[in-house]
């Protein structure tokens, strides 16, 4: 899975530690493979479909339709086809990599069409692909069973401009909010009120069909109103909330966006549906994979190798460079005091950090987390430590790399000149952070992790390996 593994590993005594960090990353991503997890959650026996414990008699429906999208859409749809075969009448899903097959056993799709969109900024081809999804939703009636694919990344991959809004309006607003460091909840509050699909609108479009959603969660806490901007879930945000988000992050949107939000706040545009709305009476959504899925697999690998696993949290959030300081402090504390766990140990965390763009470089939350950790860590450069921080979809912040593998030797202070690969001066690291160019610095140090699209998305995964010989300066 990690394409540049050999370049990431050195020939010194730390190679086993670095190798374990990469093994843990791979195990976490593979555990969240949508084909695998959906195959375990879905079963068809004697004409009855069971999804995560809920049963549906296929004889009660005249048509079975698959629709939706996201980074994990292909694997999810493939598992549904493997289970139901020709019981699926038609379908369409949208993803950023239509050829993605993270699980070698996942079959090519036959009943469901895969269409391409773009992430993290929506595109025209995404709009065209989403129209097909909405056509299927609009055609559903009370005799239809809709199997809805709701996975991380669908907020951008399924753009459906509401009312008179244009794609350009959505693009400009999305780019500005991403650059501002807005949280996913705040970003989605705006998205939901500018979309004909998000914030429960897809549930409205499919009603009165029976809808079974399968969600691969990429959000902290697995809030179904946030995953993919909650197309099948009640929305408790309002047009007024969306306006406050823009003000909070000092984002000046296109006039059409501002006009729509203003009219909505005045009650001239209908709000997104809330809990108790009839649109949700025949809708159920099941989370089949999340950050916990990946973290559990990492912990198992650690135990197998004789390292005690310690989960910090599956809900780490906030500025990436600030969150990195806590992980640096833990790495320093463990060898000195045995707290919060005695080495050798693997400290792991998930969640979703953000980056407030300060310059014109290239980077993402996991790259910035890794670079900030390497700059902040107060440990001997020869300490037996390694940190891998990746986005499980294989693309951190739209950079084309998954994240980075770093150690206490990655950044050296003045007077200890960089020598060999995997070395950066502290000045270079600080300049890169100031210019939001964590990728540039880490790529030069041969520290960027390259996986390509993984076909899943359960957000950030961080693995800190602390060996027995680690020690602070």
How should each PLM-predicted stretch be described?
Residues 81-87, 106-113, 161-172, 207, ...:
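A glycine- and small-aliphatic-rich helix-loop capping segment at beta-alpha/alpha-beta transitions
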Residues 292, 296, 300, 304-384:
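Active-site segments that bind and position negatively charged phosphate/pyrophosphate groups
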Residues 165-183, 235-251, 359-387:
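Gly/Ser/Thr-rich active-site loops/lids in small-molecule metabolic enzymes
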Residues 1-67, 75-76, 82-83, 312:
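An N-terminal, well-structured beta->alpha segment
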Residues 235-324:
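Accessory alpha-helical/coil subdomains and C-terminal extensions
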Residues 363, 370-473:
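Internal helix-turn-beta structural module
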Residues 94-142, 191:
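Glycine-rich oxoanion-binding loops at beta->alpha junctions
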Residues 178, 185, 189-251, 440, ...:
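A glycine/threonine-rich phosphate-anchoring loop and its flanking beta-alpha core
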């Amino acid at each position: 899975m990690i394409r540049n593994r050999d370049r990431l590993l050195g020939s010194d005594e730390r190679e086993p530690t670095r190798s374990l960090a990469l093994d843990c990353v791979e195990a976490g991503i593979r555990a969240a493979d949508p084909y695998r997890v959906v195959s375990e959650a879905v079963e068809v026996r004697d004409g009855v479909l069971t999804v995560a414990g809920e049963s549906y008699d296929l004889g009660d429906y005249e048509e079975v339709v698959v629709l939706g999208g996201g980074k994990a859409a292909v694997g999810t749809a493939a598992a549904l086809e493997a289970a139901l075969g020709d019981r699926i009448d038609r379908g369409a899903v949208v993803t950023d990599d239509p050829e993605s097959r993270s699980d070698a056993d996942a079959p090519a799709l036959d009943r469901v069409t895969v269409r391409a969109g773009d992430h993290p900024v929506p595109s025209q081809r995404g709009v065209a692909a989403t129209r097909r999804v909405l056509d299927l939703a609009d055609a559903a009636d009370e005799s239809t069973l809709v199997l809805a694919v709701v996975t991380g990344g669908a907020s951008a991959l399924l753009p459906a401009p509401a009312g008179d809004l244009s794609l350009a309006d959505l693009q400009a607003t999305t780019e500005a909010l991403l650059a501002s460091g807005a949280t996913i909840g705040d970003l989605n509050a705006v998205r939901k009120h500018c979309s004909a699909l998000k914030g429960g609108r897809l549930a409205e479009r499919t009603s009165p069909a029976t809808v079974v959603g399968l969600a691969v969660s990429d959000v902290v806490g697995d809030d179904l109103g946030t995953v993919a901007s909650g197309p099948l879930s009640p929305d408790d945000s309002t047009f007024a909330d969306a306006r406050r988000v823009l003000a909070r992050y000092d984002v000046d949107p296109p006039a059409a966006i501002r006009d729509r939000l203003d009219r909505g706040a005045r009650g001239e545009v209908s709000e997104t549906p809330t809990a108790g709305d009839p649109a949700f009476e025949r809708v159920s959504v099941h989370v089949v994979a999340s950050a916990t899925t990946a973290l559990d697999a990492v912990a198992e690998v650690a135990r197998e190798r004789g390292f005690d696993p310690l989960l910090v949290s599956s809900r780490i959030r906030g500025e990436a460079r600030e969150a990195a300081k806590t992980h640096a402090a833990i790495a320093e504390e463990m060898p000195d005091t045995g707290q919060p766990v005695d080495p050798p140990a693997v400290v792991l965390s998930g969640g979703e950090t953000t980056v407030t763009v300060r310059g014109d470089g290239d980077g993402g939350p996991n790259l910035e987390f890794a670079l900030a950790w390497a700059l902040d860590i107060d440990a001997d450069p020869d300490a037996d430590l390694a940190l891998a921080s990746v986005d499980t979809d294989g693309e951190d912040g739209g950079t084309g790399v998954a994240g980075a593998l770093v150690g206490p030797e990655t950044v050296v202070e003045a007077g200890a000149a960089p020598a060999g690969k995997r070395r950066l001066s502290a000045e270079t690291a600080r300049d890169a952070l100031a210019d939001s160019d964590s990728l540039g610095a880490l790529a030069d140090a041969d520290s960027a992790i390259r996986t390509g699209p993984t076909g899943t998305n359960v957000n950030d995964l961080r693995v800190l390996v602390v060996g027995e010989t680690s020690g602070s300066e």
